[in-house]
A protein has these predicted regions:
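Short glycine/serine-rich loop/turn segments
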Residues: 24-40
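Metal-dependent active-site segment of extracytoplasmic phospho-/sulfohydrolases and closely related
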Residues: 1-29
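Substrate-binding rim/cap in mid-to-C-terminal beta-strand-loop elements of soluble/periplasmic
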Residues: 1-6, 35-105
Length: 105
């Protein structure tokens, strides 16, 4: 972000920070996942993990930085990453090919 700022590209650049949902600790593999945690709690204060409907399995970060268009705020609304594809295409006035991103709106 500092480089974008120094090159004066910040206002015309969309930065999106996001992640996949939920940690996987016990998925049946012999990968020493529990031992490698070493006290780290990847699900934080939440219950569950990947493959669960609990909050640690469904919460994701989604941070957008685009100073020219997006005012800093915090939303508690439900969000699906599936919609990013069509949303970015629309934002950039790019048509989607027929059958592309059928679940994205």
């Amino acid at each position: 972000m500092n480089t974008l700022d120094s090159l004066q590209l910040t206002d015309n650049t969309i930065l999106i920070f996001t992640s996949d949902n939920g940690p996987v600790i016990d998925d049946g593999y012999q990968d020493h996942a529990y031992e490698l945690l070493n006290g780290h709690t990847p699900m934080g204060i939440y219950r569950g993990g990947k493959y669960s409907a609990y909050e640690a399995g469904t919460r994701i970060p989604f941070i957008v930085r685009w100073p020219a268009k997006v005012k800093p705020s915090k939303q508690q609304s439900l969000f699906s990453q599936i919609d990013v594809y069509a949303s970015l295409a629309s934002l950039l006035n790019q048509p989607l090919r027929k059958g592309a991103a059928p679940d994205s709106q």
